[in-house]
Each structure stands twice: as structure tokens, then as C-alpha cells.
Swiss-Prot record:
Keyword Nucleotide-binding: yes
Identification of the protein by name: Probable GTP 3',8-cyclase
Keyword terms of this UniProt record: 4Fe-4S, GTP-binding, Iron, Iron-sulfur, Lyase, Metal-binding, Molybdenum cofactor biosynthesis, Nucleotide-binding, S-adenosyl-L-methionine
Keyword check for 4Fe-4S: yes
Binding-site positions, [4Fe-4S] cluster 1: 40, 44, 47
EC nos: 4.1.99.22
SMART domains in alphabetical order: Elp3
Entry GO MF terms: 4 iron, 4 sulfur cluster binding; cyclic pyranopterin monophosphate synthase activity; GTP 3',8'-cyclase activity; GTP binding; metal ion binding; S-adenosyl-L-methionine binding
Function of the protein: Catalyzes the cyclization of GTP to (8S)-3',8-cyclo-7,8-dihydroguanosine 5'-triphosphate.
Length: 334
């Protein structure tokens, strides 16, 4: 960062002749995770709804317009943001999702997370509009267990599987299957899920997700992650480590398996590079903090959007550090 711009650009640094968003702790913001709706057609037992207070099938009126979403992304892209992930709620509830994708600036990767129910008929149009790849939530291949976890009506699981097939055919690959592990419900289905994925020959990846501990009522479903990781490592022919969060990938009998720890750890916070946007137009510096949001919903110019992006980045602070985590655990015990 040049000295003569130190006042104006205190939250930016120049890298390869490009200014990038950097928070007060030196963490670059290179990605946006944008919730484009709070509406959903499932009621998953573990859902945190991207930090919103609750899951909802509420009104459309408070959702950001395609124009605002694209304006936010365009401004962020000017300052080094290269990856965008769309989520919800269920993003495919937005009938104008393809319009949003079509107006985006050039980016390294555009992805989305979906429950897959509406994916079958839209996979091709999403790909044509600019979506690069997709994550699909699939916690069980057993219809009864799937219903218990998601609250879905009969026949829903079959729709999701057809959606996965359509996504692969459309080229939204690699498709990542998000499987939240729940003790006593689906933790014994990992091998079955790997068998399901294997015929896709690398076009589908399994992401095993440790339950995020945000509700004491769900603590009984938390798995023994250390035992699981040890088992995966013993079976793997190769283990790779992703630079971000030091997340491990295991190659097991032709299937790529990635283990995703919850966000309530210091490793995640130390490497966090994302800024989140809520469905009603608020910048969320941290998923786990609710009182530092920046309202960008009323922004009507690129300059105003840039100003609000800077403000949100200035409020980014690691929620967990090793010391903070110990203190929080002590408070819980008290």
C-alpha cells in the first residue's frame, strides 16, 4: 500500500498491481458467500441458515434484487474477490437465479449449495448462465433416515439423486456431496455413500461435515471426529492437505473424501477469507456474530457499495483464537 494513499485505502493492499481487501488482522477477503433467499423447502434438523436466527419460508419482498447482488459482486471483484458461492435457504427458490449468474463479472469460480430437489430441471440452464460447479446436501441414501434428517416428504430423495445426475451431465463438476454426520443416525453410511459416488469417476466428491455445535440439543449427535479421521487416513492411498484451513482430502478406493470441521475453531478463523451477505442485504463480517452487520440493501451507487464493503471488512475479527476458545469453553462449563 502506498503511503500517499494510506488514509483513504487503509483497508486495502496492493498485490500484483491490484488492490485487495484486507481486514485489521491481515486476512485477505477473496471470496463472497451470498445467501440469495431465506426460503427453503426442507427443515433440516441441524440447519444454521447461514447465521440467520432461524430457517424460514418467508416472503420474497425482503430479498435482494438481481441488480443489487450483481453490483455488490462487481465492486468486490475490483478488489480481489475471485470466488463467489451462492446459498440460502434454498437458492433454487429464486426463479431469477440464472439472471443473477448471467450478469456477473469474470471470476475464478462461481458455485452454489443446494438441497438438490429443484436441480434436475435447471442444471443445464444454471451452467449456461455461468455457474461453474455445485454442492448438493445429501445426508443419507436411506429414504427413512433422509426424511428424519430433512423433514422431506416421500419421493424427495429420488429427486435429489436425479438432480445430482443432471448436474454431472451439465458439467457442474466436481459436484460436492455435503454429508453432515449425525451420531446414531447416518455415521455408519459413509461406505455406502462412497459406493454411490464411485461410478461417477471423480466427477463427484464426498464432503463429510462435522456437526456445527450451535444448539445444545444437537450435541448428542456429535461424532468422534478423531476416530473418524484416523480411520480415513488408514484406508487412504493418498492424503492431501488443502492450504486453506489445513483441511484433509483422502483418496480411498477411487473416491475423494474431504473431512470438514465446523467453523467454531481457531484454525478456521485464522484463515477465513470470506465475507458473507445475507438474503435481505446485510454484510456479515463473521458467521457467528450478529451485532456487527452492515446494511448494504439500500446502496444505490458503486461508490456507496465500496464504502460499505470497506466498513464490513474493518469489522472482521477472528471469533475464535486459541485463548478465546478456552475462555468460551470455561464459560460454558460455568
Amino acid at each position: 500500500m502506498k503511503d500517499n494513499n494510506s488514509g483513504k485505502n487503509s483497508l486495502f493492499r496492493e498485490e500484483n498491481e491490484e488492490e485487495v481487501l484486507v481486514d485489521p488482522y491481515g486476512r485477505k477477503v477473496t471470496g463472497l458467500r451470498i445467501s440469495i433467499t431465506d426460503r427453503c423447502n426442507l427443515s433440516c434438523m441441524y440447519c444454521h441458515n447461514e447465521g440467520a436466527e432461524c430457517c424460514t419460508c418467508g416472503p420474497v419482498g425482503n430479498e435482494m434484487s438481481p441488480e443489487l447482488i450483481c453490483s455488490i459482486i462487481r465492486e468486490a471483484a475490483k478488489f480481489g474477490v475471485r470466488k463467489v458461492k451462492f446459498s440460502g435457504g434454498e437458492p433454487l427458490f429464486r426463479k431469477d437465479f440464472e439472471d443473477i449468474l448471467a450478469c456477473l463479472p469474470p471470476l475464478k469460480e462461481v458455485s452454489a449449495t443446494t438441497n438438490g430437489i429443484l436441480l434436475e430441471k435447471r442444471a443445464k440452464t444454471l451452467k449456461a448462465a455461468g455457474l461453474d460447479r455445485i454442492n448438493v446436501s445429501l445426508d443419507s441414501l436411506d429414504p427413512e433416515k433422509y426424511r428424519k434428517i430433512t423433514g422431506a416428504p416421500p419421493g424427495t430423495l429420488e429427486k435429489v439423486i436425479r438432480g445430482i445426475n443432471s448436474a454431472v451431465e451439465a458439467g457442474l463438476t466436481p459436484v460436492k456431496l455435503n454429508m453432515v454426520l449425525l451420531k446414531g443416525i447416518n455415521e455408519n453410511e459413509i461406505d455406502e455413500m462412497m459406493d454411490f459416488i464411485r461410478p461417477y469417476k471423480g466427477k463427484v466428491i464426498l464432503q463429510l461435515i462435522e456437526l456445527m455445535n450451535i444448539d445444545p440439543e444437537l450435541s448428542k449427535y456429535t461424532i468422534d471426529s478423531k476416530t473418524l479421521e484416523k480411520s480415513l487416513e488408514e484406508r487412504a492411498s493418498e492424503v492431501r492437505v488443502r492450504h486453506l484451513h489445513h483441511r484433509k482430502k483422502y483418496m480411498i478406493d477411487g473416491v475423494e473424501v474431504e473431512f470438514v470441521r465446523p467453523m467454531d475453531n481457531s484454525e478456521f478463523c485464522a484463515h477465513c477469507s470470506r465475507l458473507r451477505v445475507t438474503a435481505d442485504g446485510k454484510l456479515r463480517p463473521c458467521l457467528l456474530v450478529h451485532d456487527n452487520l452492515v446494511d448494504i440493501g439500500g446502496a444505490n451507487s458503486p461508490e456507496e457499495i465500496e464504502k460499505l464493503l470497506r466498513l464490513a471488512v474493518s469489522r472482521r475479527k477472528p471469533y475464535y483464537t486459541p485463548i478465546m476458545k478456552i475462555e468460551k469453553l470455561k464459560k460454558k462449563k460455568e
